[in-house]
Amino acid sequence: MRNTASDNGLTLTVYAGTTGVQLAWDAEEGLREDLLGFAIKRYGGTHPEGAWLQGGIGFPAQHHPPGEFLDTHLAPIQAFRWGDYTVRPDTDYRYELVPMYAPADALRPGATASTTLRTEKLDVAPHSIAFNRAVAASQAYSRRFGEADPHENAAARAWLARGLDDFIDAFIARAGGDSALDIVIYEYELERIRQALLAAAARGASVRIVYHAASGDEQTATNAANIAADGWPQDAVRPRVTSNICHDKTIVFSRVANGERRPEAVLTGSTNWTFNGLYYQANVGHVVDDGDVARRYLALFEQLFAGATPSDMRAWLADNDPVPSGAAVDEPLQLLFSPRPDRSDLDYYVSLIGGATRSLIFATAFDLDDAVLSALAGEGGARRILRYGLQNSASRVTGYNRELARNFTATGRLRSAPDEFLQEHTPGQRGGILMHAKVILLDFDTARPMLISGSANYSVDSSENNDENTLVIRGDARVADIYLAELFRLFDHYRFRYNWSHPAAAGEEGGGTEARRAVLDDTPAWTDRYYADANDPHAIERRQLSRPLTAAPA
């Protein structure tokens, strides 16, 4: 849901997801004098009387205990975009934007603008979407749980999962005696999900599993051991023998009548069935309640269950599920599967990215195909649009680029935290993957956004060698806004941490510092980059995101 309101020289737009709201605003030039930032007050939910949104950075003269957050009417937001990630789904809220004026030690509020919204429901056919929180390396986790290992702390697990575990369980719980679950899974590990599948089988559901299997592969040994331990009959399971990765994480739900499966829905996304995947790594679960979509996933499953080799699958997909072309390019929902005999799916993604007219934001886990990375980065004479990106590890395009209106960052944590911040840890995590979703969102501030999301890492291996699946969804603002709120949550969280550790990458994006402190500017000079040059990306962001297009982009 999106709403825009203008009053007293202010324009405020809210983009509502399920568990997050993104706010963007603009202020007329005449409001800049002595402007030290903005406060935001939210009404509704658990605080009908109103509560100030908070931040972690104050003015130089303000000191606070490490990890304590500050109300924005005391330490205002020195930006024209902010996120609220304390909302609940399907709930009414009102946001009030308040300019705050000098002096810093006795801030004066200006005239306000406000707007209302209702956050999106979690379960609305055809698309139900859940992101985990997955930021163990955060001030909020450190403040709540210290260095507690979530393996041993149920409250920490619940906070990190933020309902993604329940979301997966609820999909499996649909299955009973008149239904079936057909699964393709890379990592058959997490006890919670395994028990949910066994419970479905005990209720009478027909359960079949295709699992990743590669010679000499540690994951294969783990999968096979868990399959055996769970007692699945041999005719219900198939190893997906491959020299690469069976990287899908899909469950097809079907009704069964007269022994025939009638597919109704599919659960897909980026979430591996591991402790890391559910609790430490940023991931998404996405349910599509659509019989036609589920039928295509089931057809793919049947090929794998019948023992098709990777070569067989390349040929079968080329003949039966080609990359969209012609009139199919404009369909509101597209599916792309791999392995492909060529890089046609990657080239298709490059063409979609190149067609964006106003904005893009992405989050990816591993090294991207260079043509995909170049398209996301706006290289090669591409249209100048707002570009935001988060990669698990830094790449050649990481950092702030004014010329290309590009702000790309990588994950990080505050091992050497600023003063007044707590140290951050990832207790109990295996490996260093923090960002695991594979999402590209195009023209998100228009009436025709486009989402690309699934299991594929947009690499040559994911295209030509791995078993993967990807959704392309056009023109669904609800879906886009749910993803947008979470992408900006993760982008802003990690950008601050990466820039603190890599100040050269921040460029003009670098915030104020005072020795080992991150501080606000106690003068209105912070506004210069938003107003001095109309072509500066900060100025474009201020004008553009506060005024989303209500018609499809040209």
Language-model features and meaning:
Residues 318-389:
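Beta-propeller domains
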Residues 1-157, 165, 169, 177-179, ...:
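PLD/PLD-like phosphodiesterase catalytic module centered on the HKD motif
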Residues 297-301:
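Interdomain helical connector at the RecA1-RecA2 junction of SF1/SF2 helicase-like NTPases
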Residues 160-171, 342-350:
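Structured alpha-helical segments in the cores of large, soluble enzyme domains
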Residues 133-163, 318-343:
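Glycine-rich phosphate-binding "P-loop"
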Residues 305-320:
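Extended, charge-rich helix/loop segments that form flexible
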Residues 184-187, 212-214, 362-367:
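Structural motif
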